Amino acid sequence: MSMGLEITGTSLAVLGWLCTIVCCALPMWRVSAFIGSSIITAQITWEGLWMNCVVQSTGQMQCKMYDSLLALPQDLQAARALIVVSILLAAFGLLVALVGAQCTNCVQDETAKAKITIVAGVLFLLAALLTLVPVSWSANTIIRDFYNPLVPEAQKREMGAGLYVGWAAAALQLLGGALLCCSCPPRDKYAPTKILYSAPRSTGPGTGTGTAYDRKDYV
């Protein structure tokens, strides 16, 4: 695996990891849906994993942390845990990638470095899945409630910027992890030693080169 490809994969994975952190902290997973009577509302409601914010038409914003985890819907409760695990897993993957990087001397053996890099790629792939699942789940819940006639218009929400950042984070980590998984150990480490065998040449009487035994062997 070339060093350029390794650096590209690590950079994409790190960028996806940073986007996951932004997605976790951004209080814009759900935003107010401007439909029906809510079109003329004077405030916008944002809902995130840790707090909700109310933005007035004057530009003033007030945010409040959730009083209880049980007050959150199921998708946001699961998203809290999965996103945090994804961030920690990607951070561990970054440390593993640095250990197995070609530009570091933590490990001298090239075969071991390649295996460590593959492990880092797998960790980034798992982190991407842990980000993709809650983001897609929350988006599905928002769309389902939006078209549900039993849900009041005041409670309907639209997808916020946090979901799009989460999808971008998952895509970057998937791509970066896939590139790191392409790291293969050097083939010469596993190639069997080639031993060349040569068949003994026999000389017969009809070859004109002498008998089976050389004359010089006799006195």
Swiss-Prot record:
<comment type="similarity">
    <text>Belongs to the claudin family.</text>
</comment>
<keyword id="KW-0965">Cell junction</keyword>
<dbReference type="GO" id="GO:0150111">
    <property type="term" value="P:regulation of transepithelial transport"/>
</dbReference>
<comment type="function">
    <text>Plays a major role in tight junction-specific obliteration of the intercellular space, through calcium-independent cell-adhesion activity.</text>
</comment>
<feature type="transmembrane region" description="Helical">
    <location>
        <begin position="160"/>
        <end position="180"/>
    </location>
</feature>
<comment type="subunit">
    <text>(Microbial infection) Interacts with Clostridium perfringens enterotoxin CPE; the interaction may disrupt claudin assembly in tight junctions.</text>
</comment>
<feature type="topological domain" description="Cytoplasmic">
    <location>
        <begin position="181"/>
        <end position="219"/>
    </location>
</feature>
<dbReference type="GO" id="GO:0005886">
    <property type="term" value="C:plasma membrane"/>
</dbReference>
<dbReference type="GO" id="GO:0016328">
    <property type="term" value="C:lateral plasma membrane"/>
</dbReference>
<dbReference type="GO" id="GO:0098632">
    <property type="term" value="F:cell-cell adhesion mediator activity"/>
</dbReference>
<comment type="subunit">
    <text>Can form homo- and heteropolymers with other CLDN. Homopolymers interact with CLDN1 and CLDN2 homopolymers. Interacts in cis (within the same plasma membrane) with CLDN19. Directly interacts with TJP1/ZO-1, TJP2/ZO-2 and TJP3/ZO-3.</text>
</comment>
<dbReference type="Pfam" id="PF00822">
    <property type="entry name" value="PMP22_Claudin"/>
</dbReference>
<dbReference type="GO" id="GO:0030335">
    <property type="term" value="P:positive regulation of cell migration"/>
</dbReference>
<dbReference type="InterPro" id="IPR006187">
    <property type="entry name" value="Claudin"/>
</dbReference>
<feature type="topological domain" description="Extracellular">
    <location>
        <begin position="30"/>
        <end position="80"/>
    </location>
</feature>
<feature type="transmembrane region" description="Helical">
    <location>
        <begin position="81"/>
        <end position="101"/>
    </location>
</feature>
<dbReference type="InterPro" id="IPR004031">
    <property type="entry name" value="PMP22/EMP/MP20/Claudin"/>
</dbReference>
<dbReference type="GO" id="GO:0030036">
    <property type="term" value="P:actin cytoskeleton organization"/>
</dbReference>
<dbReference type="GO" id="GO:0003406">
    <property type="term" value="P:retinal pigment epithelium development"/>
</dbReference>
<keyword id="KW-1133">Transmembrane helix</keyword>
<keyword id="KW-1003">Cell membrane</keyword>
<feature type="transmembrane region" description="Helical">
    <location>
        <begin position="116"/>
        <end position="136"/>
    </location>
</feature>
<dbReference type="GO" id="GO:0005198">
    <property type="term" value="F:structural molecule activity"/>
</dbReference>
<feature type="topological domain" description="Extracellular">
    <location>
        <begin position="137"/>
        <end position="159"/>
    </location>
</feature>
<dbReference type="GO" id="GO:0022604">
    <property type="term" value="P:regulation of cell morphogenesis"/>
</dbReference>
<dbReference type="GO" id="GO:0045217">
    <property type="term" value="P:cell-cell junction maintenance"/>
</dbReference>
<dbReference type="InterPro" id="IPR017974">
    <property type="entry name" value="Claudin_CS"/>
</dbReference>
<protein>
    <recommendedName>
        <fullName>Claudin-3</fullName>
    </recommendedName>
</protein>
<keyword id="KW-0597">Phosphoprotein</keyword>
<dbReference type="GO" id="GO:0008285">
    <property type="term" value="P:negative regulation of cell population proliferation"/>
</dbReference>
<dbReference type="GO" id="GO:0070160">
    <property type="term" value="C:tight junction"/>
</dbReference>
<feature type="region of interest" description="Interactions with TJP1, TJP2 and TJP3">
    <location>
        <begin position="218"/>
        <end position="219"/>
    </location>
</feature>
<feature type="transmembrane region" description="Helical">
    <location>
        <begin position="9"/>
        <end position="29"/>
    </location>
</feature>
<dbReference type="GO" id="GO:0014045">
    <property type="term" value="P:establishment of endothelial blood-brain barrier"/>
</dbReference>
<feature type="modified residue" description="Phosphoserine">
    <location>
        <position position="198"/>
    </location>
</feature>
<dbReference type="GO" id="GO:0005911">
    <property type="term" value="C:cell-cell junction"/>
</dbReference>
<dbReference type="GO" id="GO:0003382">
    <property type="term" value="P:epithelial cell morphogenesis"/>
</dbReference>
<dbReference type="GO" id="GO:0010629">
    <property type="term" value="P:negative regulation of gene expression"/>
</dbReference>
<feature type="topological domain" description="Cytoplasmic">
    <location>
        <begin position="1"/>
        <end position="8"/>
    </location>
</feature>
<keyword id="KW-0472">Membrane</keyword>
<dbReference type="GO" id="GO:0140459">
    <property type="term" value="P:response to Gram-positive bacterium"/>
</dbReference>
<dbReference type="GO" id="GO:0005923">
    <property type="term" value="C:bicellular tight junction"/>
</dbReference>
